[in-house]
From Swiss-Prot:
Location in or out of the cell: Cytoplasm
Bridged cysteine pairs (disulfide): none
GO molecular function, one term: zinc ion binding
GO cellular component, one term: cytoplasm
Source organism, top-level taxon: Bacteria
Positions that bind AMP: T31, R36, A57, L58, V59, G85, F86, P87, R88, Q92, R160, R171
Pfam family, one: ADK
Organism annotation: Bacillus cytotoxicus (strain DSM 22905 / CIP 110041 / 391-98 / NVH 391-98)
EC class of the enzyme, as a word: transferase
NCBIfam families: adk, PRK00279.1-2, PRK00279.1-3, PRK14527.1
Underlying gene: adk
Role, per record: Catalyzes the reversible transfer of the terminal phosphate group between ATP and AMP. Plays an important role in cellular energy homeostasis and in adenine nucleotide metabolism.
Protein name: Adenylate kinase
Domain notes: Consists of three domains, a large central CORE domain and two small peripheral domains, NMPbind and LID, which undergo movements during catalysis. The LID domain closes over the site of phosphoryl transfer upon ATP binding. Assembling and dissambling the active center during each catalytic cycle provides an effective means to prevent ATP hydrolysis. Some bacteria have evolved a zinc-coordinating structure that stabilizes the LID domain.
UniProt entry tagged with the keyword Cell inner membrane: no
Taxonomic lineage from the root: Bacteria, Bacillati, Bacillota, Bacilli, Bacillales
Length: 216
């Protein structure tokens, strides 16, 4: 099974990715992991990527796509993979189609975990962190026993500046705009599957499992 996982920040992609790879024993491939592995192995493309990253510059598409091609050609991807964080643009998605064609494979599904932006805002702005020990809480989903006080060490809880409502709302808006052309592209190809991410996390996985189970 060859899968792509999509979803806005706070949609619960990480949790679902863990469950998919654990059950189906396929590699979870994120852009960051690919870059790190290529740089560590000092491949030609890895060294090129490193030169851009060290300068604080974006890695050009041709380098990223080359690294993706190398990674998907590896032995552990023979039975499938879960791509996360790539592609990000229609140009990258088109390049991925070419890679898959060259490898004699195709993408089976693009799983988009759908969550209303209002709920995402609540999920992302509710996080609180202990100033002393770094423990993480959530006002709704994992609240401390006593408001603003860490259960573990009694330290004061605070909200990170980039978790405030305005910053999070802007981040979501940018993500929605960037993601829409990609979703349209995959819908046209017939790969796109929308998953209700507003349910309990086990129910979300059960829905994914029913969908992809036939591919195993």
């Amino acid at each position: 099974m060859n899968l792509i996982l999509m979803g806005l920040p706070g949609a619960g992609k990480g949790t679902q990715a863990e469950q998919i790879v654990a059950k189906y024993n396929i590699p979870h491939i994120s852009t960051g992991d690919m870059f790190r592995a290529a740089m560590k192995a000092e491949t030609e493309l890895g060294l090129q990527a490193k030169s851009f990253i060290d300068k604080g510059a974006l890695v050009p598409d041709e380098v990223t796509i080359g690294i993706v091609r190398e990674r998907l050609s590896q032995e552990d991807c023979k039975k499938g993979f879960l791509l996360d964080g790539f592609p990000r643009t229609v140009a990258q998605a088109s390049a991925l189609e070419e890679i898959m064609k060259d490898l004699g494979k195709k993408i089976d599904y693009v799983l988009n975990i759908n969550v209303d932006s209002g709920l995402l805002l609540k999920r992302l702005t509710g996080r609180r962190i202990c100033k002393e020990c770094g423990a993480t809480y959530h006002l709704e989903f994992n609240p401390p026993a006593k408001a603003d006080v860490c259960d573990k060490c009694g330290g004061e809880l605070y909200q990170r500046s980039d978790d405030n409502e305005e910053t999070v709302a802007n981040r979501l808006e940018v993500n929605i705009k960037q993601t829409k052309p990609l979703l349209d592209f995959y819908e046209e190809l017939g790969y796109l599957q929308s998953i209700n991410g507003e349910q309990d996390i086990n129910k979300v996985f059960a829905d994914i499992d029913v969908l992809i189970g036939g591919l195993a």
